[in-house]
Amino acid sequence: MLVLGLETSCDETGVALYDSERGLLADALFSQIDLHRVYGGVVPELASRDHVKRMLPLIRQVLAEADCVPTEIDAIAYTAGPGLVGALLVGASCAQALAFAWGIPALGVHHMEGHLLAPMLEPKPPEFPFVALLVSGGHTQLVQVDGIGQYSLLGETLDDAAGEAFDKTAKMMGLNYPGGPEIAKLAEKGVAGRFTFPRPMCDRPGLDFSFSGLKTFALNTWQQCVSAGDDSEQARCDIALAFQQAVVETLTIKCKRALKQAGMKRLVIAGGVSANRALRVSLEKMLGDMKGDVFYARPEFCTDNGAMIAFAGCQRLQAGQQESLAISVQARWPMEQLSAL
């Protein structure tokens, strides 16, 4: 089965072609980072308009790279949520229009299920069951995964997502958007031990997260430095390191608890923050000590992309899931509502 995948949930326009027998044939991505950087964050209206501008050229590019014509495509998968409604509607409308014109089905895919399954595009994919850490700008969740569509929520953030905390902390210190990579870059030059940040909700049982207090702690630390006349680059680096260490250790502690609770030794990390090198090193060490395994997608498939949507859609269509003819998107969409295969 050959599936065209379209991703437009936020500020990346992603298109890909995935074949159930040959694997990923082509993928293309346009990031709107430069468009939104001047505003310090994503502007939904601008995001939607840019998706309209980029979608068809990217589809043509992917078809050309794969040496494919529309008559060879068996189905279209598109992101139906969660995400920005206007942005989602661009992808959904395009998918349904092309599906009608080409006489093929179009299936709405859950954005976070796409992220969760992205490591399965790698040469050594994880086997079910496993525990997944979904960590991005909009989500921080621990999920027990027994199969596609068989998801049990173990824990989630009670306020800010980890990626959101990275971005907001970076913005407080005057760093560029998106803040996550900027924090990680500065942390490499930070001096360990100058600042000690708390590990939120690690001093009590449970698998939920909270990052708003950590963000406030970072703000107060930065303001104290500025008040003392130290708004230097080194101060930013030291705060970035302390902040990143706190987030990474918190995520690692919770993942270890989740694995023990589920009785598993396989961990999948997915979402934009899963590209963070310090997080990968920490989780690899933890799983190594447990004699377990950790899986993640290649860096370009950690952030939003069309490949994960094409793959997830292909799995569901092959299992017999029927497409909906309605153009329906959801800004909020709990993964537990997805049907099991």
UniProtKB/Swiss-Prot annotation:
Fe cation binds at residues 111, 115, 304. It catalyses: L-threonylcarbamoyladenylate + adenosine(37) in tRNA = N(6)-L-threonylcarbamoyladenosine(37) in tRNA + AMP + H(+). Belongs to the KAE1 / TsaD family. InterPro entries: ATPase_NBD (IPR043129), Gcp-like_dom (IPR000905), KAE1/TsaD (IPR017861), TsaD (IPR022450). One of its GO terms (cellular component) is cytoplasm. GO terms for biological process: tRNA threonylcarbamoyladenosine modification. This is tRNA N6-adenosine threonylcarbamoyltransferase. It holds the Pfam family TsaD. The keyword tRNA processing applies. Binds 1 Fe(2+) ion per subunit. One of its GO terms (molecular function) is N(6)-L-threonylcarbamoyladenine synthase activity. Required for the formation of a threonylcarbamoyl group on adenosine at position 37 (t(6)A37) in tRNAs that read codons beginning with adenine. Is involved in the transfer of the threonylcarbamoyl moiety of threonylcarbamoyl-AMP (TC-AMP) to the N6 group of A37, together with TsaE and TsaB. TsaD likely plays a direct catalytic role in this reaction. The keyword Acyltransferase applies. It is found in: Cytoplasm. Its EC number is 2.3.1.234. Keywords: Acyltransferase, Cytoplasm, Iron, Metal-binding, Transferase, tRNA processing. CDD domains: ASKHA_NBD_TsaD_bac. Substrate binds at residues 134-138, 167, 180, 276. Its cofactor is Fe(2+).
